[in-house]
């Protein structure tokens, strides 16, 4: 069972309740705070499940449905459209954080986290994870971890217990390298990736990449 790490983080006991009120005690198979994904397991057979869709194929303007348990209103479904892909919010403060959210206007509130975002075919395209709101309740913007990221994380957690990922060992300038940004950074290059910092003894450092390089 896929959910968000922040849903089960620091929990002493986790119970999964089905729509028919059947309850199962869940075991944590693994967590990945950098993507806010967690994998649980319950001892049960024949449970219904969703098929993964390829989240890379999701199109802007596509209709989606968000399923969840907002404010303990079980089996709530809301509809919206995809308005952005690969959205970064800066909500995950981990140095290894990976944010590439699908943005939608489907209503998501506290209690929706870890729920499914599905396409019109009922296929999983994301895991509802966050909202952007001054009040803590839905104000028009919600965000989901794409299914392709969730699928990779879940596969690694099942096989290895942790997520396997490579690390280049560099920090990149987040803004697009325009002439104005290039002038601010003191470089003549106006395209590419500006290396803001290099981690000592990392893969990039060993390859000769230095702070201030443009790749």
Name every feature range the model reports, one short phrase each.
Residues 1-191, 196-201, 206-207:
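Serine-dependent protease modules
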Residues 212-215:
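Conserved catalytic motifs of ABC-family nucleotide-binding domains
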């Amino acid at each position: 069972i896929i959910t968000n790490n922040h849903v089960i983080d620091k929990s002493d006991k986790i119970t999964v309740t089905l729509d028919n009120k059947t309850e199962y005690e869940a075991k944590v198979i693994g967590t990945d705070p950098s993507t806010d994904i967690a994998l649980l397991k319950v001892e049960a057979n024949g449970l219904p499940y969703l098929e993964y869709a390829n989240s890379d194929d999701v199109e802007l303007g596509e209709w989606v449905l968000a399923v969840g348990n907002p404010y303990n209103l079980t089996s709530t479904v809301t509809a919206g459209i995809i308005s952005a892909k690969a959205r970064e919010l800066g909500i995950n403060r981990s140095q290894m954080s990976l944010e590439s959210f699908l943005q939608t206007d489907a209503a998501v509130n506290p209690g929706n986290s870890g729920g499914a975002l599905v396409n019109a075919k009922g296929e999983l395209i994301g895991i509802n994870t966050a909202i952007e709101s001054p009040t803590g309740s839905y104000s028009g913007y919600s965000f989901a971890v794409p299914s392709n990221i969730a699928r990779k994380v879940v596969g690694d957690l099942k096989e290895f217990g942790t997520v396997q990922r490579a690390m280049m060992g560099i920090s990149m300038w987040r803004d697009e390298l325009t002439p104005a940004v290039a002038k601010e950074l003191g470089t003549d290059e106006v395209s590419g990736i500006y290396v803001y910092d290099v981690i000592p003894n990392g893969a990039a450092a060993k390859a000769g990449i230095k702070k201030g390089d443009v790749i």
